[in-house]
Amino acid sequence: MSTTIKYEMMILLTEEFNDNELKTWAFNYAKALRKLNASEISVISRGKRDLSYEIANQKRGNFIQISFSSIPKYIENFSSSLKFDSNVLRFLVLNKTNNVKKF
């Protein structure tokens, strides 16, 4: 049996979303995580910001932060669904497990 690991994901979306559309998009992906047996799901909108450089001809983007716990094998499935979403400009998944050894 695999153990769950805490993850944090930052997603950069195109700026075309209004607040309601952004909430709907985030809710749908939170549901997708839930279907993959993720738990402790937290979604935070970090707002619309200017980008340091253009990405896919976009100068601004919406930032979404999603924190969750999941079994590692499901992360690849979820990441591939983000890759095929035309509204996603970039995303990053971080393992939040504390692996630091204390001496």
Curated annotation (Swiss-Prot):
Localization terms from the record: Plastid, Chloroplast
NCBIfam families: S6
Species for this entry: Thalassiosira pseudonana (Marine diatom)
Domain of life (superkingdom): Eukaryota
Keyword line: Chloroplast, Plastid, Ribonucleoprotein, Ribosomal protein, RNA-binding, rRNA-binding
GO molecular function, one term: structural constituent of ribosome
Alphabetical list of InterPro entries matching this protein: Ribosomal_bS6, Ribosomal_bS6_CS, Ribosomal_bS6_sf, Ribosomal_S6_plastid/chlpt, Transl_elong_EF1B/ribsomal_bS6
PANTHER family: MITOCHONDRIAL 28S RIBOSOMAL PROTEIN S6 (PTHR21011), SMALL RIBOSOMAL SUBUNIT PROTEIN BS6M (PTHR21011:SF1)
Record function comment: Binds together with bS18 to 16S ribosomal RNA.
HAMAP family to which the protein is assigned, alphabetical: Ribosomal_bS6
Descriptive protein name: Small ribosomal subunit protein bS6c
